[in-house]
Amino acid sequence: MRGRGLLFALVFVAYPLGAQNPDGLSVGRQMLAEDNPGELWVQRGERLFFEKRGPKGASLERCDLGLGPGKVEGAFARLPRYFPDTDKVQDLESRLLTCMVSLQGFKREDIVRERFGTLDRDSDMEALVSFIGSKSNGLKMDMPLAHPKEREAYKSGEYLFHRRSGPLDFSCATCHAEEGKRIRLQDLPNMTDAKQMQMVVATGWPAYRGTQASVRTMQHRLYDCNWQMRLPDLGFASEMSVALTSYLYGRGKGGVVQLPGVRR
């Protein structure tokens, strides 16, 4: 994306100052939030949504995100949810993956390979998630739990959140179930607290990450957490990733969406 090198340079200069002074770090975050670079991803995602692409030369205007084909307003706030056509609970990214394959003719493996952007290559998925997430701004998170598979996904995610595993014997709860924890400069939210959980899911991801000069999504956040716990790679749009997202978003019910967020 044009200008990413400049954004990265500005963040590189700003963050060492914050490292010396926590208040300086907060000021840096506020400056980014006031003129959020993530809006560039929102604009690109909107173009991609309506552009006719892929082997089938189709847009995503027939993609049903749960509220009807092409309806993006409020869709993010009502995900993950059960979709009869796939007989699965899907979050935004896994649902977009389904639509990009079935409607546009892209190969699943190609989308998965380029799911996360780099300094040299932008991710279509991250842009689309940014656009669709922003179309729920001002609305409250309200993941449905009426279908048995939605409740099953929530319960599975709860189990996974608390399950200790891997060489470090860590779980998600190891870092996110107590107050006052931090990794380096990053304060860790206590996800057992309802208000903090609402903030995480409603204003957290997708978010512009200053240290990476890119927007990252919830799937990326979960992937990275798994890696930090020295666990096997978490499959993109996998049943496990959607279960964890279902638990987090279910717990964050009522949070007011404001996306994309801004993170270190």
Question: In which residue ranges do the predicted regions lie?
Answer:
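Short alpha-helical "patches" and their helix-cap loops
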Residues: 5, 146-147, 260-264
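N-terminal signal peptide c-region/cleavage motif recognized by signal peptidases
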Residues: 14-16
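Hydrophobic, well-structured mid-protein blocks that either form specific transmembrane helices
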Residues: 128-132, 144-145
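Internal, well-ordered alpha-helical scaffold/interface segments
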Residues: 126, 130, 151, 155-159, ...
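Bacterial N-terminal signal peptides that target proteins for export
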Residues: 1-7
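Short, charged low-complexity linear segments at domain edges
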Residues: 30-47, 138-158
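Electron-transfer interface patches adjacent to heme c in soluble/periplasmic c-type cytochromes
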Residues: 20-40, 51-65, 69-127, 137-138, ...
